[in-house]
Amino acid sequence: MTIQDDMVGKHPIENDFWKWLQHEDTESSDLKRHRYLEVDSSNRDEAIKSVAAWLIKYHLSEGKKRVIRKKQEILEKHDFAEYAQSLHVFPKSDKTQKGNLGEIFLSEYLSQTSGVQILVYKLHYNPNIDQSMKGDDVLLVNPDKVLLGESKFRSTPNKRAVEEASELMKDKLTLPMSLGFIADRLFEQGKDELGEVIFDLQFKMSSIEIDIKNIGFLLSTKKVRSIVENNLSSPNSDFIFISLGMDDPAAFLKSVFDYAESNLLEGSYET
């Protein structure tokens, strides 16, 4: 077992990730803990389909799905497509698309590796879809473990991007800010018992030992591996950096949002 396995869990090898996502746990040191992920170019289309499905899941709430499903039953195909397009489910802003893609990918990956479920999809509560939401980029939590992530997207990787994805967490253990937000959403859903557990974690984090891990994430080209290896330095022993490399990340970004939008307009929005 690698240090990376111990911190965030083993890379998944028997599900959709295995088809198109390769991984390498690079050699660790006191100042560097790095897992490199790479989209397999030969399975890029599978990656686009998988990630597009995540975009729909993270942007489209169950309530909105019910309304859309009802409209789909009564509208002609062309009229339904016009209706679905008018809903503005996905951001048009390039900056927001990049931010959302990174956060969604990291959330899905960490949930797969750690087994910690995503309790609340925060983008369901975004009042302005073209602006990023404030608060923690990525937060997965259960009574025993907290995974807090900072995500960045760069078309070209560089030292500054690594620093930006690390700066909030690299020097000392960072605690989440959004536990109250998650608890409130659970209370609204009638999940009072779970909501109380999450709400109480704010106190317990300062008084008892809970496994908290900080994660920096950078999505970029395949050069990101060497950029992170050469520039990552963190004395925070609970900090790990995950990088994702692929051919032409800007084109990938456009493809996944276009595919998600197309599926929505065609009525294929169930995930």
UniProtKB/Swiss-Prot annotation:
Pfam families: HamA (PF08878)
Endoplasmic reticulum among keywords: no
Disruption outcome: When this gene is missing the Hachiman system does not confer SpBeta resistance in B.subtilis.
Keyword Transmembrane helix: no
UniProt keyword annotations, A-Z: Antiviral defense
Cysteine pairs bridged by disulfides in the record: none
Gene Ontology biological process terms, A to Z: defense response to virus
Function: Component of antiviral defense system Hachiman, composed of HamA and HamB. Expression of Hachiman in B.subtilis (strain BEST7003) confers resistance to phages phi105, phi29, phi3T, rho14, SBSphiJ, SpBeta and SPR.
Protein name: Hachiman protein HamA
Phylogenetic placement of the source organism: Bacteria, Bacillati, Bacillota, Bacilli, Bacillales
